[in-house]
Amino acid sequence: MPQIVIAALYKFVSLPDFEALREPLQAFCIENEIKGTLLLAQEGINGTVAGRREAIDALLAYFGKDARLADIDHKESYEEEQPFYRMKVKLKKEIVTMGVEGIDPNNIVGTYVEPKDWNSLIDDPEVIVVDTRNNYEYDIGTFEGALNPNTESFRELPEYVAKNLDPAKHKKVAMFCTGGIRCEKSTAFMKQRGFEEVYHLKGGILKYLEEVPEEQTRWKGECFVFDNRVAVNHALEKGTYDLCHGCRYPITEEDKKSEKYIEGVACPHCHDTQTPDQRARFMERQKQVQLAKARKQAHIGAPAPSRQK
């Protein structure tokens, strides 16, 4: 029976005192042996953490004492082992970085679509479906018929919209992401740019996989997640991908058979682009990981997925 609860959570809400929230939140999580990363900004909170059931319940109760965070959106999955190495609470300009001034999902946002209604929406031939995630996420799984903006970071999405989508031509646009935060900000951006009918999947892919039976799914593949599981399948169990710790790209068993794969160092995606200094640094890091593993200790510097959510 899984012992660890993994909670992905976020909320867009005005937090003018966000800097003062950091230290008490960090201390609470450490005291309760919760690990992961939380981002605080004036626009809200975002992150993924993991701990025992009672610890995560205590964290939700902690948020509940602040009226602004009492109804924080959170989704859970479960694992046998802690997927994170440490606890970090970071201060940021944005909780998900788009880099466009004046976007505020607290004031304007697209229409939320419940997971049970998502299939009907994306089956509509008039609806353009846009995956707001990045290439490495799209490559391992997405919804049937979804457009890939071919982005390497969320910052590139506005440029994709400017070049490829037109409010006068694309009357209905549906957007989705892993947990809901990127598509919420994306639809706020779209509304600001004059798109009228803009929809986004409430709770993101993870909520869809949780609530929609696999026999009814429009999802194809696995879903990239930002912890050491790398990806999850439709049952929200650890999928078949591992992570290249050189470039943070998800890799398959086939990739590992390549002559360009070096465990913990490089893979076919990054082998030919690494500098000698990078290669040496990654080799030394992997050596330390192996030494820690031999001593049955967690290597505190062991890399975990850190790409933009």
Swiss-Prot record:
CDD domains (UniProt xref): RHOD_YceA (cd01518)
The annotated active site, in chain numbering, is 177
Query: Which Enzyme Commission number(s) are on file for it?
Result: 1.14.-.-
Q: Does the keyword Hydrolase apply?
A: no
GO molecular function terms listed in the Swiss-Prot or TrEMBL record? oxidoreductase activity, acting on paired donors, with incorporation or reduction of molecular oxygen
Q: Which Pfam families match?
A: Rhodanese (PF00581), UPF0176_N (PF17773)
For biological process, the GO terms are: tRNA modification
Name the PROSITE patterns for this protein.
Answer: RHODANESE_3
* Keywords, comma-separated and alphabetical: Oxidoreductase, tRNA processing
Keyword Cytoplasm among record annotations: no
Q: What reaction does this enzyme carry out catalytically?
A: uridine(34) in tRNA + AH2 + O2 = 5-hydroxyuridine(34) in tRNA + A + H2O
Domain (Rhodanese) spans 123-217
Protein's job: Catalyzes oxygen-dependent 5-hydroxyuridine (ho5U) modification at position 34 in tRNAs.
Do you know which NCBIfam families this protein is assigned to? Answer: PRK00142.1-3, PRK00142.1-4
Give the similarity note.
Belongs to the TrhO family.
- Name of the molecule in the record: tRNA uridine(34) hydroxylase
